[in-house]
Amino acid sequence: TPEHQRYVELFIVVD
Protein backbone atom coordinates (compact mmCIF):
# COMPACT_ATOMS: atom_id res chain seq x y z
CA THR A 1 0.00 0.00 0.00
CA PRO A 2 1.18 3.59 -0.59
CA GLU A 3 1.14 4.19 3.14
CA HIS A 4 3.62 1.37 3.68
CA GLN A 5 5.88 2.73 0.94
CA ARG A 6 5.85 6.15 2.59
CA TYR A 7 6.97 4.53 5.85
CA VAL A 8 9.76 2.66 4.10
CA GLU A 9 10.96 5.87 2.49
CA LEU A 10 10.92 7.63 5.85
CA PHE A 11 12.81 4.76 7.44
CA ILE A 12 15.54 5.06 4.80
CA VAL A 13 15.79 8.80 5.49
CA VAL A 14 16.09 8.15 9.22
CA ASP A 15 18.77 5.56 8.62
Swiss-Prot record:
Keyword Nucleotide-binding assigned: no
UniProt keywords, alphabetically: Calcium, Disulfide bond, Hemostasis impairing toxin, Hydrolase, Metal-binding, Metalloprotease, Protease, Secreted, Toxin, Zinc
EC annotation from Swiss-Prot or TrEMBL: 3.4.24.-
Cofactor mode of binding and number, as noted: Binds 1 zinc ion per subunit.
Essential cofactor(s): Zn(2+)
GO BP, one annotated term: proteolysis
Record's comment on post-translational modification: Contains 3 disulfide bonds.
GO molecular function, one term: metallopeptidase activity
Subcellular location: Secreted
Expression sites by tissue: Expressed by the venom gland.
Record's signal peptide: none
Cellular component, GO annotation: extracellular region
Recorded family membership: Belongs to the venom metalloproteinase (M12B) family. P-I subfamily.
Assembly with partners or alone: Monomer.
Its biological purpose: Snake venom metalloproteinase that impairs hemostasis in the envenomed animal.
Stated name of the protein: Snake venom metalloproteinase Bco22
Organism: Bothrops cotiara (Cotiara)
